[in-house]
Amino acid sequence: MDEFHRCGKEDSFWQQCFLYPLFFQEDLYAISHDHYLDVSSSSRPMEHLSSNDQLSFLTVKRLIGQIRQQNHSIVLFVNCDPNPLADRKKSFYSESVLEALTLVLEVPFSIWSKSSVEGMNECKSFRSIHSIFPFLEDKFPHSNSILDARIPYSIHPEILVRTFRRWIRDAPSLHPLRSVLYDYRNSPENLQRSIIVVPRVNTRFFLFLLNYYVCECESILFSRLKRSSHSRSLSHGSFPQRTHFHRKIKHIIIFSRRNSLKSIWSLKDPKIHYVRYGERPIIAIKGDDLLVKKCRYYLLIFRQFYFHLWSEPYRVCSHQLSKNCSSSPGYFLRVRMNPLLVPTKTLDDFFIPILITNEMDPIVPIVPIIGLLATEKFCDISGRPISKLSWTSLTDDDILDRFDQIWRNLFHYYSGSFDRDGLYRIKYILLLSCAKTLACKHKSTIRVVRKELGPELFKKSFSKEREFDSLPFSSKAASQRERIWHSDIPQINPLANSWQKIQDLKIENLFDQ
């Protein structure tokens, strides 16, 4: 891939305008041929690979000629030949061409990524960001409705090709893409459908199309909202890979596509929050039922006019949020945003553009957590550990398990924080509170309890940190550079009840005033 755009910025215009000659580069098919053999070698006997799967560049050229001359009524990329040898041979060359097509389509996106990061001095390593829970807990309490808007995974081949025309100016280079999409559409399993369904074959090619399609949907949607907002503030951030991104939209006025002079609806001061995990976007809205209906209607109209896709109404469904739905975990979080370059890649390491985004650096809110611990009688208001008298009637194992559960949940949630000093202070408070509780139960001192129970006392409890550090992806060197988040919190935080009481008390005080 680096060889194709080795000339850099000077040849970017030429490469965008003339991608079709790349299809006749012999090196390109050597790369795709090697990749195809690597993928298929695990599922096919080795003797088949040595004698029959020898790449002939002349055969590849003939296949490209057939692609250009076909009328979309024949199927080149589907195994229809009853002869297994001919069937496998056809599949071998068609898959090689498909791999080459994927490499060619990645070229303009790689050029775009180089221009987008121009002027940036450094590229920091990617950190796995645990942003979904903080986002939900911070934003959703201020919302009363959510829209579950599934991104359509089916689209007509011609619409998908037209979206590529926004990036690729060389029309002949899109002919193979159009032919491949129509061939899959005309396959026996998709023959009765008017739209193409992304299959699970040739993951590299179709995963590239799926990622491109999702990015195109969201880029058009939010650019449209930004233009319609009359240059008002539109803050947004992105979180790729697992958490992808969330966007916050304020002060938006949306106009009809049919008549740009006539406003469909106007939002004076709305609060709309957008978060996506995979293909499931969730939009949280603060407003009345009319506002929710307008947002739902706009999403349906947007898909219909920009992608000529009739989206069934049930794919954008609305739900009412409970007032207490997002406060049950009972965690606090403070964040700071830093600019970050995120190079992303997916299966088979094929190209995905580098994202210029904001890095979320969570910070452990030590003061609120100590306040909660003081409310639950684990420490005093200054953070000095005290015994948990209400637990002295329990067995030693139950006491250790309860303290261990609290620490495990807190560590899993805050282990990706920028500064762990506050987290270790919480561990110190819980550790000594556990020791003082056992000492109070046995009517002795901490030293006596530790001497009687042995040095293994605290190895049973507070052990999750060592388990975390021993994970295969958590080497000592890597842990100093990266932060790995856990999200396997098995139950509600025991401190959640106290946190909920504080929130209810604040609400009651507001009404009393």
Curated annotation (Swiss-Prot):
UniProt feature coiled coil, ranges: none
GO terms assigned for molecular function: RNA binding
Cell compartments where the protein resides: Plastid, Chloroplast
Classification via InterPro entries: Domain_X, Maturase_MatK, Maturase_MatK_N
GO biological process: mRNA processing; RNA splicing; tRNA processing
Protein name per the record: Maturase K
Principal location listed in the UniProt entry: plastid
Domain of life: Eukaryota
A Pfam family recorded for this sequence: Intron_maturas2
Alphabetic keyword roster: Chloroplast, mRNA processing, Plastid, RNA-binding, tRNA processing
Family, per entry: Belongs to the intron maturase 2 family. MatK subfamily.
Cellular component terms (Gene Ontology): chloroplast
Function: Usually encoded in the trnK tRNA gene intron. Probably assists in splicing its own and other chloroplast group II introns.
Keyword check for Thylakoid: no
